[in-house]
A protein has these predicted regions:
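Hydrophobic alpha-helical connector segments
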Residues: 60, 75-103, 157-160
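Helix-turn-helix
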Residues: 14, 22-56, 60
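Hydrophobic/aromatic-rich alpha-helical bundle segments in the mid-to-C-terminal region
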Residues: 144-190, 202-204
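N-terminal intrinsically disordered/low-complexity leader segments
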Residues: 1-10, 199-204
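Amphipathic alpha-helical packing segments from all-alpha helical-bundle domains
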Residues: 74, 119-147, 154-158, 185
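Alpha-helical DNA-contacting segments of helix-turn-helix folds
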Residues: 58-68, 72, 111, 131
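Pre-recognition alpha-helix immediately N-terminal to the DNA-recognition helix
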Residues: 14-22, 92, 96
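Short secondary-structure transition hinges
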Residues: 99-137, 173
Length: 204
């Protein structure tokens, strides 16, 4: 990477990090582009070299932060050296991500408030930064290793994501209806049921 490319990356990283800090303290609606560039120490014109508006940088942050969560979960799965079934691998990843969010509640709040299926799907298939993962490739590999064909795999992951995001937010932040530790067993039963519902023909 040349000096020019390095400087561009430094400025982009500074804008992303500054925006994330402001979004998680002030909120997206109360943060202006001027706030971001002033705190990052760059000109407003520099902002528009990388992002269309503050919602573009918000979406890229959601993509990047989501990718980091999945990367950490996949690395933990690969390091576990456990022989897990397809269902168990999905639940391992979900459990790891829940634990990460439980330890970083500001990240949970940011993602939960700004995550839509469209943004999430884009996050998993279009890495924003060099260290982001392409979850689509990983998910396809997991599907290939499953003992049976998965009917409508995108619908299945959509159902799991919606279930986890809608139930864990209140449980982690407010212990409602119960704390996350008590909720997990019921959540994982539901995830198993979703996966089993999408199980098709057993592979030869």
């Amino acid at each position: 990477m040349g000096k020019l490319d390095t400087n561009k990356k430094v400025k982009e990283d500074s804008l992303l990090n500054t925006a994330f800090s402001l979004f998680t303290t002030k909120g997206v609606s109360k943060t202006s582009i001027s706030d971001i560039v002033n705190n990052a120490g760059v000109a407003k014109g520099t902002f528009y070299l990388y992002f269309k508006d503050k919602y573009d940088i918000r979406n890229k942050l959601v993509s990047h932060k989501s990718s980091q969560l999945f990367r950490n979960a996949i690395e933990a799965l690969n390091a576990s050296c456990k022989k897990l079934t397809f269902n168990e691998r999905i639940i391992f990843i979900v459990d790891n991500i829940i634990n990460q969010l439980n330890e970083n509640k500001s990240l949970l709040t940011f993602i939960a408030k700004n995550l839509s299926w469209g943004v999430f799907k884009h996050a998993l298939t279009s890495p924003i930064k060099d260290d982001d993962i392409d979850f689509r490739n990983i998910y396809d590999a997991m599907l290939a290793d499953a003992p049976y064909d998965i009917v409508q795999p995108e619908v299945m992951i959509f159902m799991i994501v919606e279930l986890v995001s809608s139930t864990c937010y209140s449980s982690i932040l407010y212990n409602e209806p119960v704390d996350i530790g008590e909720l997990k067993p019921y959540l994982y039963i539901c995830i198993n049921n979703i996966i089993d519902t999408h199980a098709g023909t057993v592979k030869a």
